[in-house]
Amino acid sequence: MNEDAKRGAGRNVKKGVDYFPHFTNSMTHSSTIFTIQEDFGNDGYAVWYKLLEYLGTQEKLYFDTNDRQRWKHFVALCKISQETVLGIINSLAEMNAIDYDLWTKHKVIWSDNFADNVASVYKKRGVAVPTKPVFLNDTESKGVPQTEPIMQLPEIKSSFDGDKM
């Protein structure tokens, strides 16, 4: 066993990330930041980065806003009205900065770009990068998301013909 493996033995794998890239050219090269700040001023900018920070604290990098306590906590962190936070998040979904379907159907926040930007952290840990949650019943507005693809079983056709016995 190598020294790194010995040192890591018995440690719990860290959940979430401690940092994420905040690119210095985001104000001029990111239509998301430009648009959200144009529409909502500094509140838009602040909510977007607080949302990314919040996603980074989550074990699977998504935020299920159906959990009322966690939602109220997030809104309180933003220091603005819930209506403004919702307006900003709706705009982020319309711009596909967060997954539109997960937000509109399930009120779950997931960002492919965020997960891609922190993937190297998980690779260094030797664990799988969290994947976008998938819901068992996509028509329900609430539910427990799955992060593993749902396997469809093939239809079994019987060759038994009862008339030929």
Where are these regions (language model features)?
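Generic alpha-helical secondary structure signal
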Residues: 31, 42, 68-72, 83
